[in-house]
Amino acid sequence: MSTTTSRTIHNLRGICSVAALGTATALATDATAQSGMNTTMLEESIYLEGLSDPWDMAFLGDGTMFFTEKCEGLSVLMPSGEVNTLLGMPEAEDSYPVAGDDLFCDGQAGMNGVAIDPDFDENRFVYVYSASNMSEPPTNRVMRFTVADDFSSIADRTDIVTDIPYKTEATDHPFGGTGAHNGGRIRFNPGDGYLYVTTGDNHNPEIPQSPTIMGSKVLRIDGDGNAAPENNPPEGFDPRTYTYGHRNVQGIAFHPETNTPIIMEHGPWHSDEITVLENGGNGGWDPRDNMAGRGDCPDGYCGYMPNQGEGMNRYERAAFMPMTDFETYPDAMPPIWTNNGWSQGTSSGTFVTGEQWGDWDGALLVGLMGIGFGGTPIGQRIDVIQLDDQLSVFDVTEMTLPMPSARFRSLVQGPDGALYVAVDSGEIHRLAPSGM
């Protein structure tokens, strides 16, 4: 039986406001967002409100929207406006027909990514990434469920990935609590049909370059959790590994023409990155101490060094602890964007397509949640990043928002062509070019 929540659905569009103009010049990794006017006028409406830390969204073609809340669970918004709760955390405030007794929320961990099987019409499968204490120590898992025909419930839980590490102990670092650097975005690539799973380093210096620990990786698997046969990791690596050597991948999107995977990743108080992935590639993140000219670091993890308690010049910090360490790993995948050297909480990204987007048709839209710590500008915004045929950045524009700035957690283009944006304050917003 479905459970309708008390949340409010708004179906009316908001007031029209200007977006940003896309004429700012930006070159490769030093691309810097500029504000201005633009030909794309955006309207905003609150699509869903009253949520608790909404984390991700996934749409069906008719507008049915699955969404997760980090400490609540999985729900589905029907085209009628009704919300059915499906899978809840044990301590969720709302009533859920199914409770995952082993699931939990802690720090950055909880119920994170959600993805819909490309063959949903035939198999009714939906996938969720969540922290679980079913094993000891706790891990992150990717779970598959079968959705009822009327979307009132889910059943047939199958854990297709069970061994993504979760940070079990606090460490002596900024933001060093349990559950940190947890990754969690999951997406199907429409080109190859595989599920891509992003994971984080847990503030553990051994994880990024480990061949067998599944943190700091992008996994490429089928719907049963098996490695894609085309994966080409280095010898000795877990065959599910598509790429490795990452810090904390928060977003992944696929180019609308080539289906090339592109990730968004938090930097270590400098240099958020966007990177075009290469099968078997190394992201170049290696925060171990006593290597690359570094000495001892707190708890053996140099990810916030040097001067981890204050805001050292970001370029000095980058020289000491590079996000992509080309000196140690000369063949590492180069980022195509580094946020002008800042770390401001790069999160999810999505490509938008359709003539309604004008010059932004085919652009990559990326949300930044903002940091504002140690002298870093907060930087809450959505950047419009335009790529050339070689997937290099040629222009970056800061979108002038028809809504207040916020912690932009998830960006997804809906089947209607609009942009849907989940923010930590508890809303999902719909942004659309004027007249849609």
Predicted segments with their positions:
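Short hydrophobic/aromatic-rich beta-strand motifs
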Residues: 1-2, 66
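Conserved blade-ending motifs and adjacent loop-strand segments that build the rim/top face
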Residues: 392-415
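Short, flexible loop segments at the rims of nucleotide/cofactor-binding pockets, characterized by
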Residues: 43, 172, 238, 397-399
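Gram-negative bacterial Sec-dependent N-terminal signal peptides
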Residues: 2-31
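Acidic, Gly/Ser/Thr-rich repeat motifs that build Ca2+-stabilized beta-propeller blades
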Residues: 34-206, 259-263, 267, 342-390, ...
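Conserved RecA-like P-loop NTPase ATPase core
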Residues: 186, 249, 411
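Short, cationic motifs built from Arg/Lys/His that form the positively charged side of catalytic pockets
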Residues: 75, 144, 217-220, 407
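Beta-propeller domain segments
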Residues: 94-105, 109-111, 119-121, 191, ...
